[in-house]
Amino acid sequence: MSKLSSNQTKTKSSGSFFRSNPVMNRLNKMDVVSAAPDEKAAGYGRITVKTAYFLLMTVVGMLAYLMLNQLLFSGQTQTLSIAYKGFTFTTSVMTIIFAAVASVLAIVTQLIAAFVPASIPVTGTVYSMCQGFIISFLVFTVIKGYEYLGLLALAITVVVVFTMSILYTTGVIRVTKKFKMVLMTLLFGMIGISLFSLIGFLIPLTRPFVSSILGNFWVSIALTVLSLIIACLFLISDFAVIDHVVENRMPAKYEWMASFGLAFTILWIYVKILDLLIQIVGKSKK
């Protein structure tokens, strides 16, 4: 299989889903260090198990939200009415605070995981649970009555991941210099759009113009689709990095980085697919 070279540029835009995989980028920039003869080398099987662990922690986070919603949130006064991409939902201040804290924790833990790889067993677990909490909030509160969109997004994500893995293992898509150049160009373009939009929104004179553009259904769909394409391409990059780790017999400690990086991208893809479905159904509701 193709190997990803160790000079891939690391880019981060932590305030949105328009971002690269920070863990995989850091892992990819490390020098190849083969395991000592008496040291366990990284293996595909253990990387798969660890990836499944992080995804399972996402489910735990989803269940945590449902439990808190039943025992705590539902008893709060539902004073907030919020419009979100064609959906209008009512919720409590406490629910919003918990969702906001989970979002901040997700951002902080992914940054710590990127810069302190040894922390991944802990930070990766917390990140995955926070993502599950946020996903559950979206599915069971924001789009209440349309919960099937969560399952539909899951089914599509499974198909996407399976398809991309087949395209990679069969060599249809290879991680070449041209591939990385296209990927980085798309990523920097999305980050540029995100920063331009943020700056424009903060300036009172341009705020109405930026809001009208970003509020346009087709513009929003186009940006979401582009972000999803980038995420899928990063999935290919993740597969290549995992090959790089295993085939170079790097120490087993790198399995945590490789598995969390893969889980990170899979969750990214799921969230973008869910966002796309929410926008489409929200538009049809109008």
Which residues does each PLM region occupy?
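A hydrophobic alpha-helical transmembrane-helix feature that marks the membrane cores
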Residues: 1-286
